[in-house]
């Protein structure tokens, strides 16, 4: 422990720094064609995955794509739609903001994934860790992940008006075949360009290292992208993006889990093997949609005006149907048929002004934002067909209510530059309104049990302060501190149980307070050019972070009231206790180190991340006079990449190793009864892989990608997957030809 404290202290003082609110350059447009492919912005605490890195990884899903970024981990299993993300120990959907071409994505369903975008459609991924941006409010404590899809300009050659792309990929582990095609074009004036891109994946079950299949992990999905950029004038851009994704197949209801409760011998004899298994599964139909329309006005000679307005809409829909031969006792897992749809409608308009006052230069950002989030849920439970209080089987699940959340916001930030020092001061005001939708089943719409679907309002300010000091041309020091908050999501506010429930409280949770967090980060960035040759670069980044949360919104289970804290006798508590409550708080801290070297002939990358976190009480007992480990804290991780460029043959080769420590900290270490809130402790492991990219000079625009994951075929069980087995060796090959 002493050594850990020394490491954290050393990281703190190595970069006694300044803080910038690392925001997007106001001159950049998330959909614009003017963004340079592969450009690494030197923003504090921002990780960038470029087009080349996306192509080299050949990932099936976004969570796998970002899994080796320092401080970022994949959670969940390896089935389609079974992945979520974790950033610095925070993994709830409301903690991680995801945007696709500026369109906010939200999906939260028990034991389901939350990211469904196809990596093949992406050109760039940026990850901003922490919540240090006044453009974003009401949650997103862990950070923001921006997914930018491909542009026509990524493919068009100089003076080319029309072109196409064909691509084929194959994975050996699950016999996956990927087919992609694109058409891209621009007009003679080069002020309008358009792209249509489609990709299809067909795969069998994944296999573990011991060759056993991960049953019902087959992939069957199709994705489509359409994109248009239109420069109305040299200073006005109109950009449109449309992303569609479809997936269907038989799979477990809990897509994040690994092992399935298989059929018994008696069931196999009665139904046959195929039907006996499908009685345990759901036939899932999934649709994911994102639309974004953006307008930018940037007069060439007017530094006071750089206006961006964006309207976006996103939706995720899942329709699950169980076999007609399935049991009729699936109330706790969305019945025998369910319909779930999450939609987000967002409008944002902002302006950036550049001006000078005395000897200081200012970059002033002012914006307005409006968000409508809607959750629609419905299930069919055939066991309740004859019960009027359950609306004859059709109703909203009590643990996944329907409702709306509206957000109205104003934000502003001024970046003041004085010589080599930049001071960033920002503020944001959010007015959040939750509106529950009364359950159509009267058993879950009972005022005597505390069921209340009335609206709840949460107004409040967030503040941001940053310093950034360029000590030398090679050394940049930064520091940020922010105080932000979030309102309860619909599930947290309006989850209920029927009046006679004994294992859980019955009431909705209209007395919840806002969850607040103070986030601090300090670090340094070092960058050198021309170290060993004229074309090499060396960079080193270090960041220390500390988060202090207050009034954490958490499900009410275990000890329900102060009177029962000593003897666990909840009978003495009020009958109208909310299903969620505010816990005292938590602390998360850690550090990340990253070094990169790139030259004409070879390159390397080293990264290390370490996070620890504790709640100020037990998750089941807010009155326990002891801290407890946070279960979602990932184990320590180091990633090493070493490779070589061979310019004469346009060949790049590399080796990547990932070293993950065991995770042996659990809430049960302090509270033996907190097992429901714990993840199984895990062993450490090391994974190795190789990759190669070849663009033969003899065949123009031909590109061959070769990747091997888990080269040594190591058996492993990632901690955040709840010990779901990892996949065995996977050899990936893709060939693309541009015309």
Curated annotation (Swiss-Prot):
The keyword Signal applies. Heme receptor. InterPro entries: Plug_dom, Plug_dom_sf, TonB-dep_rcpt-like, TonB-dep_rcpt_b-brl, TonB_haem/Hb_rcpt, TonB_Hb/transfer/lactofer_rcpt, TonB_rcpt_b-brl_sf. GO terms for molecular function: heme transmembrane transporter activity. One of its GO terms (biological process) is siderophore-dependent iron import into cell. Residues 38-150 form the TBDR plug domain. One of its GO terms (cellular component) is cell outer membrane. This is TonB-dependent heme receptor A. The lineage of its organism: Bacteria, Pseudomonadati, Pseudomonadota, Gammaproteobacteria, Pasteurellales. The gene is tdhA. It comes from Haemophilus ducreyi (strain 35000HP / ATCC 700724).
């Amino acid at each position: 422990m002493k050594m850990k404290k020394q490491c954290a202290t050393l990281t703190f003082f190595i970069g006694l720094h300044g803080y910038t609110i690392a925001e997007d350059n106001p001159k950049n447009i998330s959909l614009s064609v003017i963004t340079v492919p592969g450009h690494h912005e030197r923003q504090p605490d921002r990780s960038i995955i470029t087009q080349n890195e996306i192509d080299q990884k050949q990932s099936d899903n976004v969570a796998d794509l970002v899994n080796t970024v320092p401080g970022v981990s994949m959670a969940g299993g390896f089935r389609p739609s079974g992945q979520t993300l974790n950033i610095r120990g925070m993994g709830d959907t409301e903690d991680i903001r995801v945007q696709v071409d500026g369109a906010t994505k939200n999906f939260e369903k028990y034991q389901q994934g939350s990211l469904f975008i196809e990596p093949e459609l992406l050109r760039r991924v940026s990850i901003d860790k922490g919540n240090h941006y006044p453009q974003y409010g009401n949650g997103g404590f862990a950070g923001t992940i921006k997914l930018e899809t491909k542009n026509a300009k990524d493919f068009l050659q100089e003076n080319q008006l029309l072109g196409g792309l064909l691509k084929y990929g194959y994975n050996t582990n699950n016999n996956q075949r990927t087919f992609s095609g694109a058409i891209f074009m621009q007009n003679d004036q080069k002020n309008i360009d358009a792209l249509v891109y489609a990709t299809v994946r067909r795969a069998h079950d994944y296999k573990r290292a011991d060759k056993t299949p991960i049953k019902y992990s087959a992939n069957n999905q199709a994705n489509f992208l359409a994109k248009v950029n239109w420069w109305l004038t040299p200073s006005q851009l109109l950009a449109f993006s449309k992303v569609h994704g479809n997936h269907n197949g038989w799979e477990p209801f809990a897509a994040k889990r690994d092992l399935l409760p298989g059929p018994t011998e008696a069931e196999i004899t009665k139904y046959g093997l195929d039907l006996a298994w499908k009685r345990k599964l759901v036939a899932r139909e999934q649709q994911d949609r994102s639309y974004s329309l953006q307008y930018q006005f940037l007069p060439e000679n007017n530094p006071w005006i750089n206006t961006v307005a964006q309207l976006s809409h996103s939706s995720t829909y899942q329709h699950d149907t169980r076999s007609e031969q399935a049991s009729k006792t699936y109330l706790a897992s969305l019945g025998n048929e369910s319909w779930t749809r999450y939609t987000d409608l967002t409008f944002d308009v902002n302006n950036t002004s550049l001006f000078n006052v005395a000897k200081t230069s200012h970059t002033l950002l002012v914006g307005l934002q409006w968000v409508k989030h809607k959750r629609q849920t419905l299930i069919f439970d055939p066991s309740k067909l004859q019960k009027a209080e359950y609306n004859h089987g059709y109703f909203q699940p009590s643990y996944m209510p329907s409702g709306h959340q509206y957000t109205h916001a104003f934000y502003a930030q001024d970046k003041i530059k004085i010589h080599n020092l930049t001071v960033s001061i920002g503020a944001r005001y959010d007015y959040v309104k939750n509106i529950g939708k009364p359950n159509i089943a009267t058993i879950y719409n009972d005022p005597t049990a505390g069921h209340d679907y009335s609206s709840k309002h949460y107004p409040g300010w967030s503040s941001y302060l940053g310093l950034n000091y360029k000590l030398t041309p090679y050394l940049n020091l930064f520091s940020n501190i922010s105080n932000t908050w979030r309102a309860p999501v619909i599930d947290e506010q309006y989850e209920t149980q029927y009046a006679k429930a004994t294992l859980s409280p019955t009431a909705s949770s209209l007395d919840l307070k806002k969850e607040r967090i103070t986030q601090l980060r300090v670090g340094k960035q070092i960058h050198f050019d021309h170290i060993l040759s004229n074309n090499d670069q060396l960079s080193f980044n270090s960041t220390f972070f500390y988060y202090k949360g207050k009034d954490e919104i958490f499900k009410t289970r275990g000890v329900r009231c102060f009177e029962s804290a000593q003897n666990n006798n909840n009978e003495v508590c009020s009958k109208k206790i909310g299903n969620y409550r505010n816990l005292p708080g938590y602390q998360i801290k850690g550090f990340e180190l990253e070094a990169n070297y790139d030259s004409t002939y070879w390159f390397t990358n080293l990264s290390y991340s370490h996070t620890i976190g504790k709640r100020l009480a037990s998750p089941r007992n807010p009155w326990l006079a002891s801290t407890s480990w946070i279960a979602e804290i990932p184990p320590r991780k180091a990633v090493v990449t070493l490779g070589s460029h061979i310019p004469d043959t346009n060949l790049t080769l590399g080796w990547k190793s990932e070293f993950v420590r065991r995770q042996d900290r659990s809430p049960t270490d302090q509270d033996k009864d907190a097992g429901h809130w714990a993840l199984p402790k895990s062993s450490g492991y090391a994974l190795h892989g190789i990759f190669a990219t070849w663009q033969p000079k003899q065949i123009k625009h031909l590109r061959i990608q070769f990747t091997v994951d888990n080269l040594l075929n190591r058996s492993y069980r990632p901690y955040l997957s709840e010990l779901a087995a990892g996949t065995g060796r996977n050899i990936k090959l893709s060939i693309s030809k541009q015309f």
